[in-house]
Regions:
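Short, solvent-exposed turn/loop segments enriched in Gly/Ser/Thr/Pro and often Arg
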Residues: 45-46, 58-81, 88, 122-134, ...
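C-terminal cap/loop subdomain of S1 sulfatases and analogous C-terminal strand-loop tails that border
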Residues: 143-152, 333-339, 380-383, 387-473, ...
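A short aromatic-rich beta-strand->coil structural motif
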Residues: 30, 36, 113, 125, ...
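Active-site segment of extracytoplasmic enzymes that catalyze sulfate/phosphate-ester chemistry
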Residues: 32-33, 39-121, 132, 150, ...
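Secretory targeting and sorting signals
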Residues: 1-22
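Active-site-proximal cap/lid insertion segments
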Residues: 40-41, 150-181, 195-204, 209-376, ...
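Long, internal low-complexity/basic segments
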Residues: 26-28, 35, 271, 277-294, ...
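Loop/turn elements at helix/coil->beta-strand transitions in domains of secreted/extracellular proteins
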Residues: 26-31, 55-60, 71, 84, ...
Length: 521
């Protein structure tokens, strides 16, 4: 395994590459890998992704605005918090999904990037309930559009759109799966995008976003189903299930899966007596623990293919392209598997759900230092960051709730950086008319779901206010990094309540801007 990883990393840095195009862009290319439900505890099993830290910047305190798919992705696309996008859940009947997001499609980072001369491509998961049917509408700003038209969570029985501006004309093709694992298919389409960009737009930079569904669970799990809830590629499944198969990862990326145990996760099955009533529950039973153990191992197996995909896409770059490309890796939200006795899901304000990986590999401009920053960053910052990387004017890039992370990526000191992150969440309505919410499985299984809440996270504190509950939740995260000892009567809560009031209204008429509101009193 170590030899294989070394070979991949060497390939990304110094291996011979395909011939470069006649004209190499002066502005950098940008490749953005956005994965689905990837919690920070999976990163140690992703060698290629962790390799981005060499010559890159790791953000240790990167928080999503909501630990739920559509609100989080809407914040990413627009640079605005959910209370400003109006995208609060995953489904249209419930102030969410594509119905709530559609009005923002002309305001995503793709539009100014395309106007700035970038050739743009989007692959994989988009926004829930996007109507990918015959004659589908390609959103403004995208030159290539390869998104799920159904079945993406299954990973094998899916359909993908296949729109290429220079080749498709008025046609809006949809291609069914041929049985290939979806992550592998996205890798192939991503390499095709890079190759077509050389052909169709020589001398122009490109922006490529690759958004696999992995490691999200399947949404069609039924009693007695033998297919895993979290479906890895066949090559990464246990050897005894495929005795004649090829297993380059040892199933779990090198470590023996049998030695990986979900019960070792911080705050697993923690006593929740001091927590709000929606969290309090009995200890996790042995049968459920065994299910979670297998879920954790399958999630690790799933991200082996994501790791492969990242390596495969980056190995497609020519040497000049590699030296002139930002590579960004992040997740839309985290996930829990037994922490705080929360069985399976997300949506909470605890770190395992909202504090997710963000790694940015820089173009080669000199020293390849490995940088680490503890500055508080959020997904609302990605809009401004991508535009800053592309050289778009500050008047456009800084017009939303976030700010560019590029100075931090480059190791520059930034005065007066934000001191507080906002996390806000609206509890989804459990009714499921039409297509089911892909996260409704957690409701059907009786898993605890938080009430509607707003929270503020600083460098050393977490403060949460729940709807219809006069008592807040408070943690000193320096002394209690696992958020195990709730202290709602702490004297700091009054000050943090004021910060939270400013953040939850920021950006509205008559309210402070969100950057000003993100500073402590």
């Amino acid at each position: 395994m170590a030899a294989a990883v070394a070979a991949i990393l060497a390939l990304l840095i110094a291996s011979p590459a395909p011939p470069a195009s006649a004209a190499t862009p002066t502005r950098p290319n940008i490749i953005f890998f956005l994965v689905d439900d990837l919690s920070a505890d999976l990163l140690p099993y992703m060698d290629t992704v962790r390799g981005l830290a060499e010559g890159g910047t790791t953000f240790t305190d990167y928080y999503v605005s909501d630990s739920l798919c559509c609100p989080s992705r809407a914040s990413m696309f627009t640079g605005q918090f959910p209370h400003n996008t109006g995208v609060r859940t995953n489904q249209g009947y419930d102030r969410g999904g594509y119905e709530a997001f559609a009005r923002h499609e002309g305001r995503t980072y793709a539009v100014p990037l395309h106007q700035a001369g970038y050739r743009t491509g989007y692959l994989g998961k988009y926004i829930n309930e996007y109507p990918a049917r015959p004659g589908y509408q390609v959103p403004d700003g995208w030159d290539e559009w390869h998104v799920s038209a159904g079945g993406g969570y299954n990973e094998f029985r899916y359909q993908l759109t296949r729109y290429i501006r220079e080749e498709s004309g008025d046609r809006r093709p949809i291609a069914p799966s041929k049985g290939d694992y979806l992550v592998d298919e996205l890798a192939q389409r991503a390499t095709g995008f890079i190759e077509r960009s050389r052909e169709h737009a020589p001398g122009r930079p490109f922006f490529l976003q690759v958004s696999p569904f992995s490691p999200h669970n399947r949404v069609d799990v039924r009693p007695g189903d033998t297919e895993p809830r979290f479906p890895p590629a066949p090559r990464d499944r246990p050897k005894d299930r495929f005795p004649d198969g090829e297993f380059p990862h040892g199933d779990c990326g090198g470590p023996d899966c049998a030695g990986i145990d979900v019960t070792t996760l911080p705050s697993y099955d923690e006593d929740t007596a001091d927590k709000p009533s929606w969290v309090r529950r009995a200890p996790i039973e042995a049968k459920r623990a065994e299910e979670l153990r297998e879920d954790f191992r399958d999630r690790i197996r799933m991200v082996q293919s994501v790791d492969d995909m990242v390596g495969r896409v980056l190995s497609t770059l020519t040497e000049p392209e590699r030296r002139n490309t930002y590579v960004v890796f992040a997740s839309d939200n985290g996930f829990h598997l037994g922490q705080h006795r929360l069985v399976r899901g997300k949506s909470t304000a605890y770190d395992h759900d909202v504090r997710v990986p963000l790694l940015v590999r820089r173009p080669v401009t000199g020293e390849r230092d490995r940088l680490v920053t503890g500055a508080i960053a959020q997904n609302v910052d990605l809009f401004a960051t991508f535009l800053d990387m592309a050289g778009v004017a500050p008047a456009i890039r800084d017009s939303r709730d976030g700010r560019s992370l590029l100075p931090l990526v480059q190791g520059r000191q930034v005065a007066d950086w934000r001191q507080a992150a906002l996390v806000e969440h609206v509890k989804p309505d459990p009714r499921t008319p039409g297509r089911p919410d892909p996260d409704a499985d957690r409701l059907r299984q009786g898993n605890a779901q938080p009430p509607t809440y707003n929270a503020v996270r600083t460098a050393g504190e977490l403060y949460v206010e729940y709807e219809n509950d006069p008592k807040p939740e408070y943690y000193n995260t320096v002394a209690d990094p696992r958020q195990e000892s709730n202290d709602p009567g702490n004297a700091r809560t009054a000050s943090l309540a004021g910060v939270l009031r400013g953040l939850t209204t920021c950006g509205k008429p008559g309210a402070p801007d969100c950057w000003t509101a993100a500073h402590l009193h």
